[in-house]
């Protein structure tokens, strides 16, 4: 960080990432008064619209091209935002039905009004897309609705939504076209019986039986939505575990929590056949390694096998932009492709396919173009599974740290010993911190809690500034708060929990967890 600060004072741009430790470049000026754009962004998702707005704010003549007709990309229109709206609505229903009585709130009946639930989701999406439109107008970003394809490193042919064709020119072109649903061989998505995440956000009725193919973030979130409001959910996963990138300790408790909620898992299982000829769907499955086949029946099947970069029709090969075998555009630490003047950010390049990562890419790319300071460190991008409880992480898992050979220490603290969690009767989960043994530098933090997605950012800041577990432990945290569990886990990492009382609570909680695990194993 000291070197980066020195570079800033000298007038250099700085890009920090896992791909390169430090990159410097002098400020570059731009001509004004020309009809040609300084920056043209293809794609109006989180990476694209943020890059466009940032470029305009820095004084660049900017145009953004978006084929969907509404800004926000997959995230805002058919991803992050609508799914979180449904997750919250379904959680409220589940709480009303199963938890309110414990708090003295009773009523005779509760039911799901699915049209109203969908209406709330659509309202949230509409308000936010209109908000981005307003930001474009405020910052004087030219918005072209249509499908853009490269005809040269400085020209984009656009088939507009009005049926016309126009050519947009730019000194610098940023490709931010995002990603699309990854298909499965032999499983055809019709968005009726067999749906993608897009279709799962718009079902007209609650399926009695829902099968989710894929136990990743999206599949588990959408399975949770429909499971909470009445669907019998079965998750089919080819791998031996859910969310393979998750820390093993957290994963174990997370799966147990989902199973307690009624979600069923068929791990090490692959789909080998699909029959949609009847009223529902019949899936033929077998062990991933081969073996006896069985049939799973469902009303709706959700295909959630990941996402793939969306680059088809961009004419990348025509202008010579290099991609890897997965279709991702290859860029350097400055987001430059091998073609001068052409850049790429977000899901179309290597790195986690996350909206917030794309936003950071967009800002850093534009800041580089104007000689300002930009940075993205892919090793410190937080990730969240927005189920209940939520699971959030930043940095390395314990398994990844082991692979490096670095000696480390682990501190854990369960929410069963957290005063606020007990007060609100929602004490499931824990905080786990991994720190280097010699320096106490935090290497990874993993949280399972009702609000893990909010709590994780204390850890994200700590990792960004190379903090130690003692640094977190010595910060005064308000009492009673869920965030105290982060402090206690930090104390457990470098020393011990704060007080004898909390040590006793911790011991009691660990005994309780052990009994739970033993009982479930015995059953």
UniProtKB/Swiss-Prot annotation:
Expression across tissues: Widely expressed. Expressed at higher level in leaf and nodules.
Reaction catalyzed: 2 Fe(III)-[leghemoglobin] + NADH = 2 Fe(II)-[leghemoglobin] + NAD(+) + H(+); 2 Fe(III)-[leghemoglobin] + NADPH = 2 Fe(II)-[leghemoglobin] + NADP(+) + H(+)
Record-annotated active site: 479
Cofactor(s) listed: FAD
InterPro entries the UniProt entry points to: Class-I_Pyr_Nuc-Dis_Oxidored (IPR050151), FAD/NAD-bd_sf (IPR036188), FAD/NAD-binding_dom (IPR023753), FAD/NAD-linked_Rdtase_dimer_sf (IPR016156), Lipoamide_DH (IPR006258), Pyr_nuc-diS_OxRdtase (IPR001100), Pyr_nucl-diS_OxRdtase_dimer (IPR004099), Pyr_OxRdtase_I_AS (IPR012999)
PROSITE patterns the UniProt entry points to: PYRIDINE_REDOX_1
UniProt EC number: 1.6.2.6
Cofactor notes: Binds 1 FAD per subunit.
Entry keyword Magnesium: no
GO MF term list: dihydrolipoyl dehydrogenase (NADH) activity; flavin adenine dinucleotide binding; leghemoglobin reductase [NAD(P)H] activity
Listed GO biological process terms: 2-oxoglutarate metabolic process; pyruvate metabolic process
Compartment(s) of residence: Mitochondrion
Binding-site positions, NAD(+): 214-221, 237, 271, 306
Binding-site list for FAD: 66-75, 84, 148, 177-179, 347, 353-356
GO cellular component, one term: oxoglutarate dehydrogenase complex
Keywords in alphabetical order: Disulfide bond, FAD, Flavoprotein, Mitochondrion, NAD, Oxidoreductase, Redox-active center, Transit peptide
Disulphide bonds in the chain: 75-80
Transit peptide: 1-30
Subunit and interaction comment: Homodimer.
Family membership noted in the UniProt record: Belongs to the class-I pyridine nucleotide-disulfide oxidoreductase family.
UniProt-listed NCBIfam families: lipoamide_DH
Function comment: Reduces ferric leghemoglobin (Lb) to ferrous Lb.
The protein's name in its UniProt record: Leghemoglobin reductase
Species name: Glycine max (Soybean)
Gene responsible for this protein: FLBR
């Amino acid at each position: 960080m000291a070197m980066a600060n020195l570079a800033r004072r000298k007038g250099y741009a700085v890009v920090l990432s896992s791909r390169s430790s430090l990159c410097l470049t002098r400020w570059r000026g731009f001509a004004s008064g020309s009809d040609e754009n300084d920056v043209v962004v293809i794609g109006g998702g989180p990476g694209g619209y943020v890059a466009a707005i940032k470029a305009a704010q820095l004084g660049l003549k900017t145009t953004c091209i978006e084929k969907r007709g509404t800004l926000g990309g997959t995230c805002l229109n058919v991803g992050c935002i609508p799914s979180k709206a449904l997750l919250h609505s379904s959680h409220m229903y589940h709480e009303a039905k199963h938890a309110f009585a414990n708090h003295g709130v009773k009523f005779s009946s509760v039911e799901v009004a699915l049209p109203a639930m969908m209406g709330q989701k659509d309202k949230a999406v509409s308000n936010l897309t209109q908000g981005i439109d307003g930001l474009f107008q405020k910052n004087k970003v030219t918005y072209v609705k249509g499908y853009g394809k490269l005809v040269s490193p400085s020209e984009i042919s656009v088939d507009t939504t009005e049926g016309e064709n126009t050519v947009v020119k730019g000194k610098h072109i940023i490709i931010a076209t995002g990603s699309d649903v990854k298909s499965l061989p032999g499983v055809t998505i019709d968005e009726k019986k067999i749906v993608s995440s897009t279709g799962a956000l718009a079902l007209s009725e609650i399926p009695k039986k829902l099968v989710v193919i894929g136990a990743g973030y999206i599949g588990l979130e959408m399975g949770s939505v429909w499971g909470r409001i009445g669907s019998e959910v079965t998750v089919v996963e080819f791998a031996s575990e859910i969310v393979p990138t998750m820390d093993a300790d957290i994963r174990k408790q997370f799966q147990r929590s989902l199973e307690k909620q009624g979600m069923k898992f068929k791990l090490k299982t692959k789909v080998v056949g699909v029959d949609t000829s009847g009223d529902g769907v019949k899936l033929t499955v077998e062990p991933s390694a081969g073996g006896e086949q069985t049939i799973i029946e469902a009303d709706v099947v959700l295909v959630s096998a990941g996402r793939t970069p969306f680059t088809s029709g961009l004419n990348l090969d025509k202008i010579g932009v290099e991609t890897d075998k997965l279709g991702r555009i290859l860029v350097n630490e400055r987001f430059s492709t091998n073609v001068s003047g052409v850049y790429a950010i977000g899901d179309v390049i290597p790195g986690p396919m996350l909206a917030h990562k794309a936003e950071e890419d967009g800002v850093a790319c534009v800041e580089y173009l104007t000689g300002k300071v930009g940075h993205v460190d892919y090793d410190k991008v937080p990730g969240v599974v927005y189920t209940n409880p939520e699971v959030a992480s930043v940095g390395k898992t314990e398994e990844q740290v082991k692979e490096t050979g670095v000696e480390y220490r682990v501190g854990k603290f369960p929410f069963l010993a957290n005063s606020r969690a007990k007060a609100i009767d929602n004490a499931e989960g824990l905080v786990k911190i991994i720190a280097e043994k010699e320096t106490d530098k935090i290497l990874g933090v993993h949280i399972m809690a009702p609000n893990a997605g909010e709590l994780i950012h204390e850890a994200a800041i700590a990792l960004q500034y190379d903090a130690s577990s003692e640094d977190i432990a010595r910060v005064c945290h308000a009492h009673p708060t869920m965030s105290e569990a982060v402090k206690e886990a930090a104390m457990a990492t470098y020393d011990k929990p704060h007080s004898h009382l909390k040590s006793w609570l911790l011991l009691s909680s660990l005994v309780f967890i052990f009994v739970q695990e033993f009982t479930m194993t015995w059953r």
